[in-house]
């Protein structure tokens, strides 16, 4: 069972990964 702290940490990790992937894709699209 996950605690609230680990759940929030996992949520922020997923959010950061999604934002990083999104900005990475936009940079690649601009280079094309």
From Swiss-Prot:
Q: Which organism is it from?
A: Tetradesmus obliquus
Q: Name the major location.
A: plastid
Similarity-based family: Belongs to the PetL family.
UniProt GO BP: photosynthesis
Provide the disulphide bond pattern. Answer: none
| Membrane topology reported for the UniProt record | Single-pass membrane protein
Q: In UniProt terms, what function does this protein have?
A: Component of the cytochrome b6-f complex, which mediates electron transfer between photosystem II (PSII) and photosystem I (PSI), cyclic electron flow around PSI, and state transitions. PetL is important for photoautotrophic growth as well as for electron transfer efficiency and stability of the cytochrome b6-f complex.
GO cellular component terms attached to this protein's record: chloroplast thylakoid membrane; cytochrome b6f complex
Q: Which UniProt keywords apply?
A: Chloroplast, Electron transport, Membrane, Photosynthesis, Plastid, Thylakoid, Transmembrane, Transmembrane helix, Transport
Q: How does it assemble?
A: The 4 large subunits of the cytochrome b6-f complex are cytochrome b6, subunit IV (17 kDa polypeptide, PetD), cytochrome f and the Rieske protein, while the 4 small subunits are PetG, PetL, PetM and PetN. The complex functions as a dimer.
- In Swiss-Prot or TrEMBL terms, this protein is called Cytochrome b6-f complex subunit 6
Give the Gene Ontology MF terms in alphabetical order: electron transporter, transferring electrons within cytochrome b6/f complex of photosystem II activity
Q: Give one Pfam family.
A: PetL
- InterPro entries reported for this sequence: Cyt_b6/f_cplx_su6
Q: Which domain of life is it from?
A: Eukaryota
Q: What compartments host this protein? A: Plastid, Chloroplast thylakoid membrane
Q: Which gene encodes it?
A: petL
């Amino acid at each position: 069972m996950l605690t609230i702290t680990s759940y929030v940490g996992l949520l922020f990790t997923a959010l950061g990964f999604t934002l990083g992937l999104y900005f990475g894709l936009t940079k690649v699209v601009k280079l094309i």
